[in-house]
Regions:
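Conserved alpha-helical scaffold segments that buttress catalytic/binding sites
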Residues: 2-346
Length: 346
């Protein structure tokens, strides 16, 4: 569809792009790349199918956003989805699942049965990282802001590395039920549970990670967060306790944002939200933020004058008989697009 024929008040058109928008990546300000990949998920699989499901659900969305009115008109484009990632994910997921089953049955990573499988998974994840990094670099070098739609939470690594090569210092607003600070969880160096550990290790340009709504993490993760000097933890229970004591959500959001530098990457795991928003996400945890709390946090970030330099939405798991996960993912993606464009000026 040509841009001149696009009617934002008309019926959403399923043209293979997020939100059915007509923008080409070459002319848009914001380019969305996709990573259909969920090799290392440790509980429920399915996030690899999120990009297609979110594209389909996103055409049911109306465009007016009172917090970022008209921002979409500056251009939100969809880069071609590389479905070779999905094919590799499906193949390697079988190896990863056998490793996980072996460990859950009391086996060890040193056992001959799993050694080659772990190696294949790790090599495949490195290839995925390179693929995402190359996609991101192409559009960053063209002057675009890049957002990523996963996929599991391992998928943004290549984008974050690419941003690290182009920014001297930035922070990450990490909204998630989990800290993702595990070192090679289940033997997988680039596990979805290891993304922030890997960022701390490999991207020194990330000066601060503000982790929000985390509520399921290990003792070693808590110790790393407390000792690193680069992690600020706003766990779900502490946020709830502050509300119970009378601190408004607006005040808490300002406190969270104050922990971050001027340039910020947003990493949004859908399991940060309450169950009704993402009933099929791979590793659900009781508690969490409401949708509007999350949106208010994003708006607080942009109202502070900080600039969003990129983002991801991950761990959306569509179900064949229920659409709420994809709907929530599409609507959170829309809010992130609007806030990102707003934060980057007119």
């Amino acid at each position: 569809m040509e841009q001149k024929n696009f009617d934002p008040d008309g019926v959403g058109v399923d043209n293979g792009t997020y939100f059915g928008l007509p923008f080409a990546p070459e002319t848009a300000e914001l380019v969305l790349i996709s990573a259909p990949w969920d090799v290392t998920v440790s509980y429920g699989a399915g996030a690899a199918y999120a990009p297609d499901a979110i594209i389909e659900a996103s055409t049911q969305l109306d465009f007016y956003d009172p917090l970022a009115p008209g921002a979409w008109r500056r251009g939100i484009a969809t880069a071609d989805v590389d479905y070779s990632l999905l094919e590799s994910s499906q193949r390697l997921r079988a190896d990863a699942a056998r490793v996980i089953d072996h460990l859950e049955g009391g086996g060890c990573l040193e056992d001959d049965y799993v050694v080659r499988k772990v190696r294949r998974v790790n090599e495949g994840c490195m290839s995925m990282n390179a693929n995402v990094g190359a996609q991101a670099s192409r559009w960053l070098d063209a002057g675009k802001t890049v957002g990523l739609v996963g996929g599991d939470h391992s998928t943004p690594y290549g984008l974050i590395r690419a941003l690290g090569a182009r920014h001297a210092a930035f922070g990450i607003l990490h909204v998630d039920a989990h800290c993702d600070l595990r070192d090679a969880y289940e033997g997988f160096e680039f596990s979805h549970a290891s993304i922030m550990f890997n960022v701390l290790r490999d991207v020194p340009q990330v000066t601060k990670i503000a982790q929000v709504a985390v509520r399921d993490f290990s003792e070693s993760e808590a110790a790393l967060a407390a000792s690193s000097g680069r992690v600020a933890t706003f766990d779900d229970l502490s946020l709830a306790a502050a509300l119970f004591r009378g601190e408004t959500w607006d005040a808490q959001c300002r406190r969270i944002v104050d922990a971050l530098p001027q340039e910020v990457y947003v990493s949004f795991d859908i399991d940060a939200l309450t169950f009704e928003n993402c009933p099929h996400t791979g590793t659900p945890v009781s508690g969490g933020l409401t949708f509007n709390q999350a949106v208010w946090l994003l708006d607080t970030l942009t109202r502070s004058g900080r600039r969003i330099i990129g983002f991801d939405v991950v761990e959306v798991c569509p179900a064949p008989d229920e659409r709420i996960d994809a709907i929530t993912g599409a609507r959170m993606l829309w809010k992130l697009c609007g806030q990102t464009l707003k934060s980057n000026g007119s």
